[in-house]
Amino acid sequence: MSNSIIQSPDLGDVTGYLRDRIRTVPDWPQPGVMFRDITPLLQNPKTLRVLIDVFVHRYMDQNLDLVAGIDARGFILGSIIAYELNLGFVPIRKKGKLPFQTVAEEYELEYGSATVEIHADACKPGDRVLLIDDLIATGGTMMAGRKLLERLGATVVEGGAIVDLPELGGSKLLQASGLSLFTVCNFDGH
């Protein structure tokens, strides 16, 4: 995983610049959780451009076919990256949200389970796909998204996210499964 400092002549430490603009909301959605809110990155045109440029520069020469984004904030980031790279975008949705024939993958949550789905014709065998989400916590959602894409015959080149919460173990789990990861920054705790 790459959390190295990204440098820019205009901004200096781009990683720090973006990290400093992520809002921390204590005790949301439940007591003890420090929620990492990326909406300030999206609301400011300069930070949004810097954020997207970090991903575009990383992936512009990777010979990708598609970008897949995980419901819901992965849609925002993933679709813009796909547009900038002149690629198609594939939504990975929560169960029951896609209108056509789907393939589903269940994954475990802290208290129970959830399911994500992808259209059965979302990609074809051999497609090289970048998988995007806003944040890696336990890794369950990104792992499920990867499994869906691979079941359709695609190769997930890398998983990308803005934030990694390494103490929750998701990035370690994903890397142990063989998935290469890129995150812009990380935060301690959850």
UniProtKB/Swiss-Prot annotation:
Q: Can you tell me which family this protein belongs to?
A: Belongs to the purine/pyrimidine phosphoribosyltransferase family.
List the protein's name.
Answer: Adenine phosphoribosyltransferase
> One GO term of the cellular component aspect?
cytoplasm
EC numbers for this chain: 2.4.2.7
Note the CDD domains from the entry.
Answer: PRTases_typeI
Q: Which gene encodes it?
A: apt
What one GO molecular function would you report for this record? adenine phosphoribosyltransferase activity
Q: Does the keyword Glycosyltransferase apply?
A: yes
InterPro entries, per database record:
Ade_phspho_trans, Adenine_PRTase, PRibTrfase_dom, PRTase-like
Which species does the entry assign this protein to? Answer: Cupriavidus metallidurans (strain ATCC 43123 / DSM 2839 / NBRC 102507 / CH34)
One Pfam family here: Pribosyltran
